[in-house]
Amino acid sequence: MNAAGDEQPGKYLEVFMEAYSDFARVYDIFMDNVEYEKWAEYLIGSLKEYGIEDGIVLELGCGTGVMTELLAESGYDMIGVDNSEEMLGEAMEKRAESGHEILYLEQDMREFELYGTVRAIVSVCDCMNYITEEEDLLTVFKLVNNYLDPDGIFIFDMNTPYKYREILGNTTIAENREEGSFIWENEFDEETGINVYDLTLFLPREDGLYERDEEIHYQKAYEPEKIRELLEKA
């Protein structure tokens, strides 16, 4: 991929759509510290609290399908939407192993389409932060509202400006494993609210050598008040 500095703000999501290519192969390995089971327990508890014991649930930004599978295991009829063909490929491998009847759709969150409404929509692991334009985030919220049942609920998480500024900041993280190695360089611009993940991967090849690949990801920090404002507008 090209260097991050050459991209215009309106193209951040397009660059993200090109990412997760080689990283999809090892995404679950390097994300094994995420407590998906606890996340699933929280989501399921919240769904049941609002009377959603079963029915169709949509996951936006489903990635490799880890959470989608956990919700399907709990009896929900799952639809997973993601814009990465490679990530969905990993998700479909999980589906083949589990036998769950999950519908996966390769779609842009800003333009996703369904044939009808759903009981609930969920989005985890800061997927909404990848929507870097305010008007695009409003569009996503409007689509969510359009495809939810009248008594449906929308559950999502987003990274806050505090996390980007104080926790991630301008840091570098490196990890080496048998399955591959990565260098994660993080840079947060407080003025624009844009956070850049520059990810360098070293993945083993069959000939014993390593292949180097670089992926650049952009996220946007939104103030909680702005998120509430956009939700109310939707």
Question: Where does each model-flagged region fall?
Answer:
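Conserved class I S-adenosyl-L-methionine
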Residues: 12-61
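Residues lining the SAM
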Residues: 124-126
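A short His-aromatic
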Residues: 129-131
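SAM-dependent methyltransferase
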Residues: 155-230
